[in-house]
């Protein structure tokens, strides 16, 4: 406790320098907390929306269906797989489905849709599309269909209107039927609002000639962190049934890669911030050691072991980093808490966000406790590593060398001399500046290195982002769209054959 009081007292000797260092650490930590929460919020939203609106946490298919998507690779109702999966520990809910594609049309409007035939009683326990209805109601029975707000706009339909769906049935024939639009949903995700539709399971089985069968069983797990364990348990339970059990990472590998990419960008930025924070801490500790050379010399002359001097310097560093971390935590949690409640509105960039599956126009940062622990451990560790050299220098000198260290440095600087006349005031100021720099060359080198690293990191991140977006533009224009397209008005939205340019 006495050493801790001494460490706090030493930090109060130069309060301005300590305050500046604390502020730099706090701003760095606060920025890291918010950045990590922001990226975690993006990733969590993509995962929650895609699993919550479409896939569920896991699916059971007949083996081969996921790769080939052929309708004749189906599960039979008589196998009672839904009941078996529901009985597995860790599974919260299950629902059978028939999924396929259809061409929906009304008068002169048409659009391709991904159709999901669902059990209206069990589907809401696995997904939440029923809670996103903005007009009309959810499915009940008969030839009813639920469409997204973008699809409804493209097809010009509202609840009460009819759509004609044309499909290729499981037996290879062409199936068609009329369906009443009973509801319109809005998730804020273009690829769902524009291209996903639901109908009652029996209606889908009739449309696709799928009586007594379904393409998949979707399930919701009780604990998302135990998904792999539950997938393995379900797979073992059904190992004799020639089925495959896939969790959402296997169902949506592009989403997994997108999450990994976001994490990689976060780690790069975090590394840059940590280096800058370390430079600020080592600067403070180095100056403290230099200015207190006489104090350390007296302590060693009175019998204090050099190891205790090193311990004192490292303790001061730990206190400095710890206080900076706590202040940064308060700052970061305050900012993150505000935006977690109110969200960050990126609706102006909704077109760009369409490239990230499941991401809507408003992002809500999420805080994970383990991230805060990691930041705290790394901040203190980086600070101790940065202070190791100054601490070792403070403890390795003899009492006489320690007491004369500062005077020796000052005398060495005074020997640096330039013959400058009074008419060259600019050179006089340059001489004074150089003397200040060379007064502590090690500190100056650390500061210059930190500045150079920060600039290099900024240029790298800027070039990385610039190259990333430039590559996206080039790949899209060279391989697909070209630089300019001429089309009938509205064709880019509806993709209707009727919206064509006359010969």
Model region roles, listed by residue range:
Residues 98-100, 111-118, 132-203:
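Hydrophobic secondary-structure segments that place a key small or acidic residue at a functional site
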Residues 169-266:
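Mechanotransmission and gating elements of multispan inner-membrane complexes involved in transport
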Residues 286, 297-340:
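Transmembrane alpha-helical interface segments in multi-pass membrane proteins
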Residues 327-374:
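Short helix-loop junctions at transmembrane helix boundaries
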Residues 362-413:
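C-terminal membrane-exit region of the final transmembrane helix in multipass inner-membrane proteins
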